[in-house]
């Protein structure tokens, strides 16, 4: 029975959900597969996408960006953690090589902790990665803004990427030129489990009332201005925020069974920050997106640019979201600029097929 080891970056929820969609497709196509998932993401998040068995291996090989919420970054703490990993990389590599050999791993797939490429090389196991950007891309932008202490980290990550055997490059991507073998892939993500009619019945929502899903990833936002919802009594809002207030036109989704993508079929808008998984799943479902801008995070510009190309959208500033009156809900959505170039909607299928062909 083949064994595939999946390593997921220690940042937010989006990397976890998009790689989990690949694992779910694999398990559907091949039940005789040992799956190991190395991550610090909560187990419930994995289980919301996966129905098959897996070994939950709590490990962290990178940091991404340390944030207080989905928009605010702590660069100093990020640098400290990166330097710790870099200083202790030999020990981290040796420990994980021992684990890989003990579990007879045949293939490593990562999204997208760079150190895993070195771990795979030391273990003599092929390493494939998936992603739309590398962390060197994020940190290099900081270097160019004057944060020169990230320069050595950026070079280190680029060198690690060169050890990867194959990259599945997702839509909304930067060039990722540090990888030698690149295969472009379509949108990845989960598929909704319910129809619009089933969701309206289950949550007792009026089928003709306009609905907006408020979703901001695993890090959420500080102080979502819920008071603005009172200005739109004809709208039904939906949130996964556990701290949301009790409002007549706000439906709070509790527990971990449902995912944002499961609610998208009933929604006329998704209001979100720029994150790959939310935008990718919204594009797949075909629901328009109201997207906040995000300063200081270079991936956000690429994500927003891609959203404008491929989906109905409206781009708003954090100031309009936090301090404005939310009249963007009454504005006409912008049409996609390049609808004829929309990527394939089944990227997880292409990746799963390639993995199974290799095994």
Per-segment meaning from a language model:
Residues 95-158:
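Conserved nucleotide-sugar donor-interacting segment of glycosyltransferase catalytic cores
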Residues 107-111, 129, 259-302:
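A donor-sugar binding/catalytic signature common to diverse glycosyltransferases
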Residues 8-20:
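A short, glycine/small-residue-rich beta-strand->loop->alpha-helix junction that serves as a flexible
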Residues 327-359:
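C-terminal amphipathic helix plus adjacent low-complexity
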Residues 138-139, 144-221:
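A nucleotide-sugar donor-handling region in carbohydrate enzymes
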Residues 10, 33-87:
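Conserved nucleotide-sugar phosphate-binding/catalytic loop shared by glycosyltransferases and other
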Residues 252-255, 288-335:
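Nucleotide-sugar donor-binding patch of glycosyltransferase catalytic domains
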Residues 23, 190-269:
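Donor-nucleotide binding loops and adjacent catalytic segments primarily
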């Amino acid at each position: 029975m083949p064994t595939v080891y999946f390593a997921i970056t220690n940042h937010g929820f989006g990397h976890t959900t998009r790689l989990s969609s690949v694992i779910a497709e694999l398990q559907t196509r091949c039940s005789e597969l040992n799956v190991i998932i190395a991550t610090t993401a909560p187990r419930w998040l994995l289980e919301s996408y996966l129905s098959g068995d897996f070994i939950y291996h709590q490990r962290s090989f990178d940091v991404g960006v340390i944030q207080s919420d989905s928009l605010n970054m702590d660069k100093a703490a990020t640098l400290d953690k990166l330097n710790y990993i870099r200083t202790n990389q030999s020990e981290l590599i040796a420990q994980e090589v021992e684990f890989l050999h003990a579990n007879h791993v045949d293939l490593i797939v990562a999204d997208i902790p760079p150190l895993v490429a070195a771990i795979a090389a030391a273990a003599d196991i092929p390493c494939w990665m998936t992603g739309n950007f590398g962390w060197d891309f994020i940190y290099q932008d900081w270097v160019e803004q004057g944060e020169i202490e990230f320069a050595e980290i950026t070079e280190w990550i680029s060198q690690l990427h060169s050890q990867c055997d194959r990259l599945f490059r997702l839509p909304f991507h930067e060039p990722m030129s540090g990888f030698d073998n690149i295969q472009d892939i379509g949108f990845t993500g989960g598929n909704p489990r319910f129809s619009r009619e089933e969701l309206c019945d289950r949550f007792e929502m009026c089928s003709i009332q306009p609905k907006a899903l408020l979703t901001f990833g695993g890090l959420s936002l500080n102080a979502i201005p819920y008071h603005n919802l009172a200005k739109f009594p004809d709208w039904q809002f939906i949130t996964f925020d556990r701290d949301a207030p009790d409002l007549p036109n706000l439906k709070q989704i509790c527990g971990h069974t449902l995912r944002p993508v499961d609610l998208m079929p009933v929604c006329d808008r998704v209001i979100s920050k720029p994150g790959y998984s939310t935008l990718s799943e919204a594009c797949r479902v075909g629901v328009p997106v109201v997207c906040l801008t995000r300063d200081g995070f270079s991936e956000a510009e690429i994500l927003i640019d891609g959203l404008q190309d491929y989906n109905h959208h409206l781009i708003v500033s954090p100031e309009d979201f936090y301090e404005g009156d939310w009249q963007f809900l009454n504005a006409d959505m912008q049409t996609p600029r390049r609808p004829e170039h929309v990527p394939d909607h089944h990227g997880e299928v292409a990746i799963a097929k390639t993995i199974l062909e290799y095994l």
